[in-house]
């Protein structure tokens, strides 16, 4: 069933609410867009049970966001740069042959790249402090939906680049487990790596390993996009020339239209009013210059109000 067929079946029902009253055109249009987005994801990305309209947020730096807006490229970092020792994998798995000689498999892990989001519903002090420097106060939070992220990825890499069996990418919620379970998963992966006949299974198995995280991090409510970079070599039109925009550390950049998936941008709540005003102004200029205005969309750019409170007056009967 095509995306159009999947959404056409429900067009009539979208014009009424549960009680049968007609809905306004604006409400119907918004509702219809959400349903179309859900139908597209279910048709083209049947690898996750997460509702495509689930809001997700990404914490990054102002510099990375501005580079993404200007280059129209989404940056995925090497998984070897992740701080948790159970995530970088090559630092945790030591392979030996039967004579206890070390086997170097780091070249396999270096081709994997990832990006982390969260399903946390509100501003999170935990994530602002964990993902953004307290000293530099240069953090930003991007709001989107799971479906928009997946759709931008599929369009960015060219959906024809993905095989029917998804052994080249993952985009889903992270599974949190005890340390012992994570270690067992890596042992299974190590067995595949040291047996050449199993190499065809290494990529999907490593992707699966990169979708688990220790229970200690469960408060992050993480969603991950993980890619095997080797699978996309030979598809240069889908990727941005790294010589034009340099990210640090080096990663994988795929072409993306920011207007397709960014719904809101919040800047660091730890900035003073004056500092925040300058950052918001610069980002708003980028937003206007790189696409939103031309497609008739607006995106909210503001400072996070995590540390702001409304004035409260308490009257005492003395």
Where do the PLM segments sit?
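Partner-binding and oligomerization surfaces adjacent to conserved cores of proteins
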Residues: 1-318
């Amino acid at each position: 069933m095509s995306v159009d067929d999947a959404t056409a079946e429900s067009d009539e029902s979208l014009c009424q609410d549960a009680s049968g009253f007609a809905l306004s055109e604006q409400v119907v249009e918004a509702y219809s867009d959400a349903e179309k987005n859900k139908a597209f994801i279910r048709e083209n990305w049947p690898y996750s049970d997460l509702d495509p309209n689930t809001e997700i947020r990404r914490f990054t730096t102002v510099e990375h966001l501005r580079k993404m807006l200007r280059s129209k490229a989404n940056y995925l970092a090497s998984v070897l740069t992740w701080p948790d020792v159970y995530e970088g994998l090559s630092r945790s798995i030591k392979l030996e042959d039967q004579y206890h000689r070390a086997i170097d498999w780091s070249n396999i892990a270096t081709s994997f790249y990832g990006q982390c989001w969260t399903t946390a519903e509100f501003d999170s002090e935990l994530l602002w402090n964990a993902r953004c420097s307290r000293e530099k106060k240069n953090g930003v939070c991007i709001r989107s939906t799971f479906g928009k992220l997946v759709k931008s990825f599929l369009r960015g890499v060219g959906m024809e680049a993905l095989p029917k069996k998804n052994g080249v990418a993952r985009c889903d919620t992270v599974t949190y487990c005890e340390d012992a379970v994570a270690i067992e998963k890596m042992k299974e992966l190590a067995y595949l790596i040291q047996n050449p006949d199993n190499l065809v299974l290494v990529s999907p198995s490593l992707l699966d390993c990169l979708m688990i995280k220790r229970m200690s991090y469960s408060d992050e409510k993480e969603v991950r996009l993980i890619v095997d970079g080797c699978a996309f070599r030979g598809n240069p039109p889908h990727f941005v020339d790294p010589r034009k925009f340099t990210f640090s550390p080096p990663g994988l950049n795929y072409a993306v239209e920011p207007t397709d998936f960014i719904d809101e941008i919040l800047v660091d709540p730890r900035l003073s009013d004056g500092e925040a005003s300058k950052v918001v102004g610069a980002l708003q200029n980028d937003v206007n210059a790189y696409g939103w205005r031309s497609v008739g969309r607006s995106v909210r750019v503001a400072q996070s109000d995590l540390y702001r409170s409304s004035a409260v007056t308490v009257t005492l009967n003395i």
